């Protein structure tokens, strides 16, 4: 093991030890901010945005690109063979909560800064996993002036220029309560209205099956949570469903919503949007991000299904790609790990990008 990787693992060991699970997002008391402030070669600019959302900007010189790494993680869950917050290093892997998603990238960047860089810009954020993105949205408001943004997520050290967007919402249906022996239950039951809508929505989602970008095909649509009703002999007066879909770059959201028939109708139904974020690239034009990939000399990835905050930068007019060590299939599960060889590769690639 070379000295650069040893230093990287030292930083990763520290980062994993801080419980930055989101929820509960207790960043202030986790030790993370104290650790970054204790590093003499850093001068972190910390912005407290409230509710556990912190932007931590590291900047020096005149960098062309800015790196973004989220330092919050999902909760550990059950099934770990070791302490999730104690980095377990084997001959091939570094195992620990956030090692793959995506504290490994942060450790790489801290290593390179410690070894000496003249020009760099790194934004650590802490609220990606909750689907808030307050950190990125607020940072964008400062009108950052960079040639592009490299958002860190586990991509096997390949450059991602294209991924799906995300849209969630709640459709609520209203009925007229009464005894279920009444024939009107067929029409007045809110659950009946909901199931009819679900049938329509599934068919509408399938109508997009022939649309594709690379290996990404159709509209990823999911009925996620249903609630409503009281008991079998009462006509349900209210029922709701939470659903989501993942559009391809260039797909029109309003057109999709119209196809799903999410309109609110007086005394019948109401629709409430949830978390909404664009695809990457936000305008559907891959040209700028592909040019950025060439400029950075990164190996390209196929388009991916998962969403990242790169799309928010893209929406704001900043070319953005997704890049980082680790495989997404190893994230969000017990015994999360990143391969040591990928950390070594990422160190070299990040070094080349900065220089």
Predicted regions and their residues:
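N-terminal helical capping/dimerization or prosegment-like subdomains
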Residues: 1-77, 238-244, 256-259, 340-342, ...
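Short glycine/proline-enriched coil/turn segments at helix->beta-strand junctions
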Residues: 38-43, 59-65, 113-121, 143-146, ...
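Short beta-strand segments
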Residues: 68-70, 123-125, 150-153, 172-174, ...
